UniProtKB/Swiss-Prot annotation:
This is Pulmonary surfactant-associated protein B. Homodimer; disulfide-linked. Residues 25-200, 280-381 form a propeptide. GO terms for cellular component: alveolar lamellar body; clathrin-coated endocytic vesicle; endoplasmic reticulum membrane; extracellular region; extracellular space; lamellar body; lysosome; multivesicular body. Its main location: secreted. Residues 25-65 form the Saposin A-type domain. Disulfide bonds join C69-C143, C72-C137, C100-C112, C208-C277, C211-C271, C235-C246, C299-C366, C302-C360, C325-C335. It comes from Homo sapiens. Pulmonary surfactant-associated proteins promote alveolar stability by lowering the surface tension at the air-liquid interface in the peripheral air spaces. SP-B increases the collapse pressure of palmitic acid to nearly 70 millinewtons per meter. It is found in: Secreted, Extracellular space, Surface film. Keywords: Disease variant, Disulfide bond, Gaseous exchange, Glycoprotein, Repeat, Secreted, Signal, Surface film.
Length: 381
């Protein structure tokens, strides 16, 4: 994908800092306490145990800590700079207006557009000026804390390995991306606050649900894998032993960074910031199944077509993909156009034996659903 096309997706990044990501930080403290032998078995385990820097320096290759920190901060700065391009606000605004127009409850359309008018400029300005690259990279274990560690008393043993000291807050909001809430937004309620004791409506208007739903829709549209490939071009100082691993690692931890930005910053925060919403995600109506994704979206089309093709011989793949377009719920014309457009790439991807979602993710039409840590772009790894 050309960089000019990637730019428009990068410009969607900052307002989605609080989107629901897919990185699951579930490795237990007991497992991580096993030490480097466990941490460095895979990139995902190194990340979950906050030992990525250790594994890169001591186990997987020879690289200085300062180099790793600079690489990580470079990636964050690149993403941040690209997100501030002139077309950013126009691209985001048009996308959100389109989402307002396809809300399942038409009564919400005027309120949705009013929320955009009132709060869109505030949110954009805030996130463009508050990203803390060092905090994000420190969370990944690629940068050291700028504050000296407290000295340990003689005779006292540390029960946990270094990467597990100082457990991270959950969410990370206060220390990473939102170090200080802006006074103007913190002090005054917005015109669309959820406080119904002060404003009486014929029905309770679910602005907080609306806010979260819009953020989730934006986050789902960002092709993290494609962005990581572009950002990997900054890889220049990781002299690992096997050829190609440098670029692969850059792609991998670019996706990790994106997941940190998109996944660990909960949608409740932005909506609380501008609408005084509760941090309780159970409040208000739930998003409809599939978050009102159209049934014939490219991701759905791709997964249906790929599933059908995966059950066929290599010679029969083209016919099998067209046969999938006769499915009862698919838009036949859109499906055929999709097959015609992507047949060359799918003929290469389908025989690799990946599941349908991984194949469509590699094609760039589905977002990351499971682990983002597979380096699918380098067949040698």
């Amino acid at each position: 994908m050309a960089e000019s096309h990637l730019l428009q997706w990068l410009l969607l990044l900052l307002p989605t800092l609080c989107g629901p990501g897919t990185a699951a930080w579930t490795t237990s403290s007991l497992a991580c306490a096993q030490g480097p032998e466990f941490w460095c078995q895979s990139l995902e385990q190194a990340l979950q145990c906050r030992a990525l820097g250790h594994c890169l320096q001591e186990v997987w290759g020879h690289v200085g800590a300062d180099d790793l920190c600079q690489e990580c901060e470079d990636i964050v700065h690149i993403l941040n700079k690209m997100a501030k391009e002139a077309i950013f606000q126009d691209t985001m605004r048009k996308f959100l207006e389109q989402e307002c127009n396809v809300l399942p409850l038409k009564l919400l359309m005027p309120q949705c557009n009013q929320v955009l008018d009132d709060y869109f400029p505030l949110v954009i300005d805030y996130f463009q000026n508050q990203t803390d690259s060092n905090g994000i990279c420190m969370h990944l274990g690629l940068c050291k804390s700028r504050q000296p560690e407290p000295e340990q008393e003689p005779g006292m043993s540390d029960p946990l390995p270094k990467p597990l000291r100082d457990p991270l807050p959950d969410p990370l909001l206060d220390k990473l991306v939102l170090p200080v809430l802006p006074g103007a937004l913190q002090a005054r309620p917005g015109p669309h606050t959820q406080d119904l004791s002060e404003q009486q409506f014929p029905i309770p208007l679910p602005y907080c649900w609306l806010c979260r739903a819009l953020i989730k829709r934006i986050q789902a549209m960002i092709p993290k894998g494609a962005l990581a490939v572009a950002v990997a071009q900054v890889c220049r100082v990781v002299p690992l032993v096997a050829g190609g691993i440098c670029q692969c690692l850059a792609e991998r931890y670019s996706v990790i960074l994106l997941d940190t930005l998109l996944g660990r910053m909960l949608p409740q925060l932005v909506c609380r910031l501008v609408l005084r919403c509760s941090m309780d995600d159970s409040a208000g109506p739930r998003s409809p199944t599939g978050e009102w994704l159209p049934r014939d979206s490219e991701c759905h089309l791709c997964m249906s077509v790929t599933t059908q093709a995966g059950n066929s011989s290599e010679q029969a793949i083209p016919q099998a993909m067209l046969q999938a377009c006769v499915g009862s719920w698919l838009d036949r014309e859109k499906c055929k156009q999709f097959v015609e457009q992507h047949t060359p790439q799918l003929l290469t991807l389908v025989p690799r034996g990946w599941d349908a979602h991984t194949t469509c993710q590699a094609l760039g039409v589905c977002g990351t659903m499971s682990s983002p840590l597979q380096c699918i772009h380098s067949p040698d790894l």
